[in-house]
């Protein structure tokens, strides 16, 4: 089992949970690897990943996949995911580079897990980056970042799931392209349902900083 690992909250929680479950089952942690991309030997993810693994005493799980900058190809990403939204294309381009590196090193590897959906579930996006948003509009709209992810509601359309389609495709299609099967525990209905029931307004009291801390507090409590 490979975790697409940045050392952040979402992929970190996934790695710790899978490692725990393997130990509970009596399986070897050697079945698990944390794959981190490094482009031209640079990037914050590789350092953050090393720091996380060191702090959790799981350094033996880490593996850095190093690629040349030319390997991160947005045009290839557009062809694979058949989409044009800049953030989704950027995400897919990076994932494709990482997955090609994993496939080159491990021709028989099949299963991958990532933390996609963690930001949406706990509204962990900078409000300041979008002039149309306010703290009130974010915390009072339970499906703001779950465009199409709703469990009991339809946000836009009965036939188009919007953000959910994009979220699935940007992970699923690159994985399929290289012969992997990928899964995110943050993108299943049960978890999304819990996230939509969180009383964000009451917990944050109108504070940006409190909202940004909330994700770490919730995930840390669960872990």
Would you name each region that the model predicts?
Residues 1-222:
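ATP-dependent adenylate-handling active sites, centered on carboxylate activation for C-N bond formation
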